[in-house]
Amino acid sequence: NIFTFKKFFNLMKSFLIALAFLTTTFSQAQDFAKHVNPFIGTGGHGHTFPGATVPYGMVQLSPDTRIDGSWDGCSGYHYDDSTIYGFSHTHLNGTGVSDYGDIMLMPTMGEPSFDNKIYSSTFSHANEKASAGFYSVNLDKHDIDVRLTASTRVGFHEYTFNKAGFANIILDLNHRDKLLEGTVRIIDDTTIEVLRRSEAWARNQYVYARIEFNVPMKFTSVKSNSVTKGDFYSGTELKAYFSKMVKKGEKILVKVSLSPTSYEGAKLNSSEIKHWDFEKVKKEAETLWNKELSKIEVTSDDKDKLAIFYTALYHTMMQPNIAQDLDGKYRGRDNQIHTAEGFDYYTVFSLWDTFRGAHPLYTLIDKKRTSDYINTFIKQYEQGGRLPVWELASNETDCMIGYHSVSVIA
């Protein structure tokens, strides 16, 4: 009868809802991130990087082993290399042109130097590890253990100095790209603010940063070719280092928050990590990756196939990158500061590469971000006069053919 049918229907409906909930909970509880191998693609012509980032994050904190802008140095790292020049906070994944490598820090021991041939260090892959949201390495020359993790807008460094002595942290704003404008503002002995405006593939890129140390650091020296006024330094050549006597095994922690808009934006974004618990941030990054990777569940007894699949999925989620501050402010195509209302603003639209495969995938597994991407396209059209072709840091690079943003919108 009708009553029995309705009762059965409601029972089945409740069962299916419960099953869907349990399936979702089970998928999210699984460790998909363990299958990710960030070293896949870092050799040959893969042009990927192994460093720490979260899905679609503003920060990609990774070692730089190539600084010459070469074809196989597009990501800043190549597996064949054995020298690390430093750890910078922005990197491109899988592109055919070099850029980024912004806000580079390098820990050293002994007499400091501004020469990257001197402050760089050899390293061994035997002492290097990477997983989703985490990277670590030992710097042979200085015997410093480096561990890196990140939130969306903040890079988190942990340096362990295995020898007692004079420890330094080098800040090199001339790292990789041409420096158009650099500034360093000393706030106090644990905080500095930085602007790096550079030119490479993106012809006018702005990166503001707030750098915080967990212990007081002595501002030891600066190299500048322009203005030096008290605690403010600027120029098109700008490097600085900060020093401290350390005991054997002592750790120094550094947080670097980024903003495309202002010093105030970088300070606001620093609130993503209000503490100095490295392990907590590392775990949170891993959780974010598991949440995103759980959108596609693949089972296999072949661990290599799982590594290939989930690393490929991981690589699709390393970009586009969020390009707005926590309050929604972003730098538009007109180089003015705007506020995103009702959507999130993104950058790095390699549309010639991504319109066929990546964007259809986003449409299936991430409808919210797909809407954000399209709204970003529309704002760039309003501010710059056309939809993006190959957009980078709110700059149109005009790279490759076609007008593939139309296909993504359609």
Predicted regions located by residue number:
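Bacterial Sec-dependent N-terminal signal peptides
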Residues: 1-30
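Accessory carbohydrate-recognition regions in carbohydrate-active enzymes
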Residues: 30-359, 363-410
